[in-house]
Curated annotation (Swiss-Prot):
Protein's recorded name: Sel1-repeat-containing protein YbeT
Family: To E.coli YbeQ.
Keywords: Repeat
The Sel1-like repeat ranges on this chain: 64-98, 100-135, 136-169
Family annotation (InterPro entries): Mitotic_Regulator, Sel1-like, TPR-like_helical_dom_sf
Gene from which the chain derives: ybeT
Induction, per UniProt: Repressed by the toxin-antitoxin module MqsR-MqsA.
Organism (species): Escherichia coli (strain K12)
Disulfide bridge map: none
Length: 184
């Protein structure tokens, strides 16, 4: 067995033990270790190892890995088939740990009806979870939903509220949209 494979195996074992010992919430140390493993394994030719590492740590509760596994299923990438049900499952696991990117993706799934019946109200709930943590993309999307009345009544006040929060984070599209909204 060559040195690279032994090193990869050691990283998997350490990551698995760390994830098992922290089932509810991951620590900064856990995140750093898993991110290091992902960076190391992201070199050309390491796809099976990256996917396996992601799946292993996702199963053991690592929020970022759960989000990434959701991405694999949502896009049918990294050796995983396109499967909206699995994507939603893994995003939900990550969202329960307050991962704003996963919460925002759940909003997208419900807004677009990917594997579920479109549900603007559920989408808004998930986007708000992420937006209230300061996640600019979710804030911007909420601003658009309220501005355009996507499945709900137009609400300029809510639209401006979320777009202003997004603009404070230098999100240029939000700044442009704010210029065209009626003042409140």
């Amino acid at each position: 067995m060559n040195k690279k494979l032994m090193y990869i195996f050691a990283i998997f074992i350490v990551a698995a033990i760390t994830c098992i010992s922290q089932p509810k919430k991951t620590t900064l140390r856990d995140k750093a270790m898993v991110n290091y493993a992902f960076d190391y394994l992201s070199s050309p030719g390491s796809l099976p190892f990256t996917t396996a590492a992601t799946e292993l740590s996702a199963i053991h509760g690592h929020s970022t890995s759960q989000y990434r596994l959701g991405e694999f299923y949502l896009h049918g990438s990294d050796g995983k088939p396109l499967d909206y049900t699995q994507a939603r499952y893994w995003y939900e696991q990550s969202a329960e740990q307050e991962n704003p990117r996963a919460q925002s993706k759940l909003g997208w799934i419900y807004l677009k009806g990917l594997g579920v019946k479109p549900d603007t109200r559920k989408a808004i709930l998930w986007y708000k979870e992420a937006a209230e943590q300061g996640y600019a993309h979710a804030q911007y999307t909420l601003g658009l939903i309220y501005r355009n009345g996507s499945g709900i009544n137009v609400n300029h006040y809510e639209s401006q509220k979320w777009l202003k929060l997004t603009a404070k984070q230098h999100y240029k599209n939000a700044e442009r949209l704010l210029a065209g909204l009626p003042a409140h």
